[in-house]
Amino acid sequence: MQNSASEFLKPRLIDVQPVSATQARVAMEPFERGYAYTLGNALRRILLSSMPGFAPTEVSIAGVLHEYSALDGVREDVVDILLNLKGVVFKLHGRDSVLLTLKKEGEGAVRASDIDLPHDVEVVNPDHVICHLAAGGKIDMEIKVEKGRGYQPAPARVKQDDNRQIGTILLDASFSPLRRVSFSVESARVEQRTDLDRLVMDIETNGVIEPEEAVRSAARILIDQLSIFADLQGTTVEVVEERAPQVDPILLRPVDDLELTVRSANCLKAENIYYIGDLIQRTETELLKTPNLGRKSLNEIKEVLASKGLTLGMKLENWPPAGLEKP
């Protein structure tokens, strides 16, 4: 039956009851029996795991080398400061990351409103307390805020080529703007049918996104993920095999083809230089360090390479090519 999907009831009534600026109850009905549980659970999981948000990911504090330090004139230790900083709710408009500064001195509370913000960055909870300064105390910090999804522990963002400055502290980042999502299923009735369901979702956000918009976004994600199942005979994604980059054939020739003197050729092979591609990546300094290879032999090599349009010290990507063996 091609039109069997149209035989199912679709929810026609959607009731949104705001509880507060960040909390709402969304009710939808009617559903066929069991569908409210299926869709409610799917939407809840997407809401909690897949909504984009913003969180501080890196912090550097003047005079602090690691999170187990303490600051003179600051009531809280660094661990407590970082925990409080995670509670600041940021909202970035039109950008994915930003570096913010916070400088304050003098006795009193340091709040999120004390952070220096550009025009396209907003703090949703400006009264949130980060730390307390004693008389004569001061604090100077830089905060990196990024956009992301879900939860990312600090070690997962460490890269091998990371050039972070000493004293930069990585934070575990919880990007999700959803604080709480729950759902319940009640009985619903349409005319004489009483075997229907009503889905009620209680949603609380951190203020970055409205509860109603969060449900819309989650539904769009679910529809997009399920669309491929609607037509299993549809267009498949063609997998294009990545071809190996072309290598100049002359680079694959053995150094013996350069017709160097026996002395020079033996010196190169002793350094595991078997192909012309191996040779041109060496510099003059490296070759002069080769035992028994002097300036005269070096000049000979340079002249032969020049006759073929090559020089020493060239850089080759993807060398040696796959399958290349010693001659």
Curated annotation (Swiss-Prot):
Region span, Alpha C-terminal domain (alpha-CTD): 247-327
Keyword Cell division: no
Keywords: DNA-directed RNA polymerase, Nucleotidyltransferase, Transcription, Transferase
Positions of region (Alpha N-terminal domain (alpha-NTD)): 1-233
Domain of life, per lineage: Bacteria
GO biological process entries: DNA-templated transcription
The keyword Cell membrane is assigned to this record: no
Enzyme class: transferase
GO MF entries: DNA binding; DNA-directed RNA polymerase activity; protein dimerization activity
A Pfam family it matches: RNA_pol_A_CTD
TM stretches of this protein: none
Catalysed reactions listed for this entry: RNA(n) + a ribonucleoside 5'-triphosphate = RNA(n+1) + diphosphate
Record text about domains: The N-terminal domain is essential for RNAP assembly and basal transcription, whereas the C-terminal domain is involved in interaction with transcriptional regulators and with upstream promoter elements.
Assembly information from the UniProt record: Homodimer. The RNAP catalytic core consists of 2 alpha, 1 beta, 1 beta' and 1 omega subunit. When a sigma factor is associated with the core the holoenzyme is formed, which can initiate transcription.
NCBIfam families in UniProt: PRK05182.1-2, PRK05182.2-5, rpoA
Family, per entry: Belongs to the RNA polymerase alpha chain family.
Role, per record: DNA-dependent RNA polymerase catalyzes the transcription of DNA into RNA using the four ribonucleoside triphosphates as substrates.
Name this protein carries in UniProt: DNA-directed RNA polymerase subunit alpha
Organism: Laribacter hongkongensis (strain HLHK9)
